[in-house]
């Protein structure tokens, strides 16, 4: 690794001992080695800290931080972004797995085309035992040269796992970071797309894990937002209508900040208005679910047998 690493991998974790070691093995076993791994432990109460300390002693690329209290998922994610020293940045999760060549191929794609702002790969879903159960379709036209088309497609055509791609850090810091409202990951990713096209490595190198304990399974908007930031737990200060309005305002703010012409911004505002009109419904904590107000993810059976062990560096396995 160079004195100042070219890439920062940021991993925010809270009580992740069940899959954390697996994820660290996959990240530290990457064929691309010029990166630092910034871990922010959100005051975990399980064995996460011990795992992080053990790996930090073995690999100097790890910078481990522990929050004195639970600051919430969103501020914890933003903390690792603020700590980044690399010109490139990738968000990692404690329970996901990564093919050995993921970072190498994403960095190469960004080097080959300075106009691209983010590179990722095709993704598949794995279970608790790291077996592939389905693949994530990617019908989104994030490679379009026109920002207006990328914006339209991300609102109407579906969704993927772009927020976990390798992105140019300067672009990342031009916009808003992770908000503490429902779907903040989507406004975050769409803002990146307004700055430039994405590139998808045509291979399954990212494995998103579905398991019973993950925060993404929280369906109630109030509970989800309180997980993102404990200050959201106050029901009176954070009615559902406000959380929904913040979500919509996230898109408006992204358009306002984007490096677009007045005509392009006007086009995006009209697309957003059409999208909102098509989804107008009474907003309650039940209706504002993961797929209720944004392009839905679609899945398919694996087109071929995909072996996680064949492409992912594996060492320690999950804590049972």
Q: Where on the chain are the PLM-derived regions?
A:
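Short loop->beta transition adjacent to catalytic acidic/histidine clusters or analogous donor-positioning motifs
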Residues: 4-7, 28-39, 47, 60-63
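Conserved nucleotide-sugar donor-binding catalytic segment
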Residues: 9, 82, 99, 143-225
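Short, well-formed alpha-helical segments that are part of the catalytic scaffolds
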Residues: 15-29
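Acidic helix N-cap motif at the loop->helix transition within catalytic regions
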Residues: 21, 46-54, 101
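A conserved acidic beta->alpha catalytic loop
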Residues: 41-50, 69, 93
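Glycine-rich, basic loop-to-helix element that forms the pyrophosphate-binding segment
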Residues: 67-84, 97
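Short aromatic/hydrophobic "clamp" motif used to bind/position activated sugar donors
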Residues: 89
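Conserved donor NDP-sugar-binding/catalytic core segment of glycosyltransferases
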Residues: 101-135
């Amino acid at each position: 690794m160079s004195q100042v690493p070219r890439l920062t991998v940021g991993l925010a974790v809270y009580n992740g001992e069940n899959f954390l070691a697996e994820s660290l093995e996959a990240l530290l076993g990457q064929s691309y080695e010029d990166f630092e791994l910034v871990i922010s432990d959100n005051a975990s109460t399980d064995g996460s800290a011990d795992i992080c300390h053990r790996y930090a002693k073995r690999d100097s690329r790890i910078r481990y931080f522990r929050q004195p209290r639970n600051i919430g998922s969103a501020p914890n994610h933003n903390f690792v972004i603020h700590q980044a020293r690399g010109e490139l940045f990738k968000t990692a999760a404690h329970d996901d797995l990564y093919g050995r060549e993921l970072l190498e191929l994403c960095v190469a794609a960004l080097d080959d085309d300075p106009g691209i702002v983010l590179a990722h790969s095709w993704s598949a879903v794995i279970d608790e035992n790291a077996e592939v159960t389905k693949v994530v379709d990617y019908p989104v036209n994030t490679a379009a040269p026109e920002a207006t088309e990328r914006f339209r497609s991300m609102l109407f055509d579906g969704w993927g796992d772009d927020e976990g791609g390798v992105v140019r850090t300067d672009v990342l810091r031009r916009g808003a970071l992770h908000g503490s409202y429902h779907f903040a990951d989507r406004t975050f990713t769409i803002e990146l797309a307004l700055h430039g096209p994405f590139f998808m490595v045509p291979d399954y190198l990212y494995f998103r894990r579905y398991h019973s304990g993950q925060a993404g399974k929280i369906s109630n908007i109030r509970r989800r937002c309180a997980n993102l930031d404990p200050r959201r737990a106050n029901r009176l200060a954070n009615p559902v209508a406000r959380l929904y309005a913040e979500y919509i305002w996230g898109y408006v703010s992204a358009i306002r900040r984007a490096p677009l012409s007045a005509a392009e911004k006007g086009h995006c505002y009209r697309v957003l208005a059409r999208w909102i009109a098509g989804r107008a419904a009474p907003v309650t904590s039940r209706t504002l679910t993961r797929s209720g107000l944004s392009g839905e993810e679609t899945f398919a059976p694996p087109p071929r047998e995909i072996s996680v062990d064949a492409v992912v560096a594996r060492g320690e396995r999950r804590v049972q």
